[in-house]
């Protein structure tokens, strides 16, 4: 029998700042803020990140080729405003839009070496590690795949330790699984265990007592063209009050790059999606007593918690969250049994659907999707579940290669429903992409080929070790693994896109024939895609969770566009789209920084109109 629970949402305010913090004079007339950015030597600086914050809302734009920047209309009031670019010190000021609507900046170059390193996003930190010898390149790949399964490289490598210190860190990290659970005395990450000594020596050579060492600071071009026309609106989500964290005088939340990549302690959001009214919903992934999911009012920044009760007064936490084509918000809920939940944004009614005994529960790194028939799909440890919203009934489809094979870590990661009602999923640890045909009831699977260049780097000792190796969790891959993570369907074109997190590529599947090809990311060695989402124009959006960027791929031109995110250490997992009235919003959660963000891209005409308005006296 299907068990269904209906739960009322929690309406109590969330302590420690989840309640509304309004920008000053939020009801006053909107104002235009603009200015120019130049270097200390007087040169105009294009592509500089310029942010303005009031209350819990931060708006970010980028300067154009002439060094000028133009914000969209902002509520009149007082703002903190800052400008930053890699290798330059952050410039800060305050502006009252009731009195002034222009703020110019002069950026001075950073002269302190460690301050330059601290600014870097994860891909540039990784790029700076030595690769002068085959052994260097071999160890660099092990760092990339096995030291970044739960955090960006910049979180650890912004610091320096001697060989003893790096040994102690690796000793600890090899006992923590991908979910952040310490397994002291239990099973360890065998890859880190095997390579521990040489990894510690390698890291100490790069980020050790000697300033600079073998580490090479690299930067990247600042945004131009379409990427420089992006506008970000970020909403702060207060840290988990259960952890009783002290309020710092200068919070490190990734907003000021000079302070480095933040700690993730207390951050709640994981996935995020907009409802049809433009408000933002996010899954709360960290154990807490207040919320399972939260809703952000996009106009005010107010956060409202919705709680599903679990044991001992805790909230049933979530991981995956989507909006279906009817506007309903679906998410998984970890209660006594991994379940599916829905909230109607209009009525705020929450419903919970528990899989019947005998079926797999919805657990693991859960991803959700819906298909062309409106059925909801969710990942399990053994495959996928389909939920029929009309009949309120579950069906199960299991992986051909069971999760117990090859070390027992073959649970489902990505899930996508195609236009014909079929489902596709990935087993990340096994490099498998699977499909269930609903009409025939048959399943099939594809094993992705290894990353050949990485196999060539392995020495004889490595080869001998890996011959008997089986991953201990999804975060302990072979150095040559592809790591198919989350996936997305272009239902109109009949194309599945797979984000290969370790392989630095997208896989393209024809959903009718199963034919597959690869599309490499612009820099496969450092770019790690997490998800793939397709817009109405067939563009593929993939968050690169260690680079603080989101990439757009246009299959018609084979062109990539990289959009810089305004926060350092975002660890963005998924992009959700809202396409209405000719306007596209790209919604992302920043799990490490405890924010939810909306990106829009202005047209050249939009920007020209703002320039004209700003020039008026």
Which residues does each predicted region cover?
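Conserved beta-strand positions in repeat-built beta-propeller and related beta-rich domains
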Residues: 274-275, 280-287, 329-336, 376-381, ...
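Short Pro-Gly-centered beta-turn/loop motif in secreted/extracellular proteins
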Residues: 43-46, 70-78, 86
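Blade-level signature of beta-propeller repeat domains, shared across WD40, Kelch, NHL, RCC1
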Residues: 566, 570-617
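Beta-rich, blade/repeat-based domains predominating
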Residues: 244-246, 263-276, 312-325, 358-373, ...
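Short, acidic Ser/Thr/Gly-rich low-complexity loop/linker segments typical of extracellular
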Residues: 55-68
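Structural motif
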Residues: 34-45
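The canonical Cys-X-X-Cys-His
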Residues: 143-154, 199
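A short, solvent-exposed loop/turn motif at the edges and junctions
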Residues: 55-56, 78, 82-94
């Amino acid at each position: 029998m299907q068990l269904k629970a209906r739960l009322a949402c929690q309406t109590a305010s969330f302590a420690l700042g989840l309640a509304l913090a309004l920008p000053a004079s939020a009801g006053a007339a909107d104002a235009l803020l603009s200015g120019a950015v130049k270097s200390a030597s007087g040169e105009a600086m294009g592509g500089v990140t310029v942010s303005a914050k009031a209350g819990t809302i931060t708006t970010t734009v980028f300067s154009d080729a002439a060094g000028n920047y133009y914000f969209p209309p902002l509520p009149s009031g007082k703002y903190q405003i800052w400008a930053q670019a890699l290798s330059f010190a952050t410039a800060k000021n305050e502006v009252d839009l009731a009195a002034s609507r222009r703020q110019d900046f002069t950026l001075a170059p950073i002269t302190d070496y460690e301050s330059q390193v601290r600014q870097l996003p994860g891909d540039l930190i990784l790029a700076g590690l030595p690769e002068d010898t085959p052994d260097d390149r071999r160890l660099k790949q092990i760092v990339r795949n096995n030291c970044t399964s739960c955090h960006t490289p910049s979180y650890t490598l912004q610091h320096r330790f001697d060989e003893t210190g790096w040994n102690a860190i690796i000793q600890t990290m090899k006992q923590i699984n991908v979910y952040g659970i310490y397994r002291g005395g239990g099973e360890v990450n065998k890859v880190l265990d095997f390579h521990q000594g040489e990894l510690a020596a390698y890291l100490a050579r790069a980020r050790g007592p000697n300033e600079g060492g073998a580490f090479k600071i690299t930067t990247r071009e600042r945004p131009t063209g379409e990427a420089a026309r992006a506008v970000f609106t970020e909403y702060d989500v207060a840290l988990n009050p259960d952890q009783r964290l002290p309020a710092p005088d200068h919070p490190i939340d990734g907003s000021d790059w000079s302070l480095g990549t933040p700690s993730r302690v207390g951050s709640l959001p994981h996935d995020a999606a907009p409802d049809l009214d433009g408000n933002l919903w996010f899954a709360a992934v960290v154990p807490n007593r207040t919320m399972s999911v939260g809703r952000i009012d996009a106009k005010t920044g107010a956060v409202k918690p919705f709680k599903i009760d679990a044991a001992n007064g805790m909230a049933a936490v979530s991981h995956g969250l989507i909006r279906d084509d009817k506007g309903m918000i679906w998410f998984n809920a970890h209660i006594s049994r991994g379940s599916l939940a829905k909230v109607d944004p209009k009525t705020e009614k929450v419903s919970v659907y528990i899989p019947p005994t005998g079926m797999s529960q919805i657990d693991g790194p859960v991803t959700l999707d819906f298909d062309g028939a409106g059925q909801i799909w969710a990942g399990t440890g053994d495959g996928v579940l389909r939920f029929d919203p009309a009949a309120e009934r579950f069906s199960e489809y299991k992986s051909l290669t069971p999760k117990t094979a090859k070390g027992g870590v073959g649970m489902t990661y990505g899930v996508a429903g195609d236009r014909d009602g079929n489902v596709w999923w990935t087993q990340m640890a096994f490099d498998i992409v699977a499909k269930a045909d609903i009409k025939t009831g048959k399943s099939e699977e594809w094993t992705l080929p290894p990353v050949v260049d990485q196999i060539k780097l392995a020495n004889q000792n490595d080869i001998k070790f890996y011959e008997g190796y089986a991953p201990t969790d999804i975060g302990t891959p072979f150095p040559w693994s592809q790591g198919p993570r989350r996936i997305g369907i272009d239902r109109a074109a009949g194309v599945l896109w797979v984000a290969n997190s370790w392989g630095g590529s997208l896989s393209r599947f024809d959903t009718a024939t199963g034919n597959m090809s690869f599309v490499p990311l612009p820099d496969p060695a450092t770019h790690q895609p997490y998800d793939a989402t397709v817009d109405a124009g067939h563009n593929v959006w993939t968050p690169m969770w260690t680079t603080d960027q989101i990439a757009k791929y246009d299959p018609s031109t084979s062109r990539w566009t990289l959009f810089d995110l305004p926060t350092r250490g975002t660890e963005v997992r998924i992009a959700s789209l809202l396409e209405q009235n000719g306007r596209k919003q790209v919604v992302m959660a920043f799990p490490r920084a405890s924010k939810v963000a909306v990106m829009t891209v202005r047209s050249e005409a939009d920007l020209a109109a703002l320039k004209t308005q700003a020039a008026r006296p």
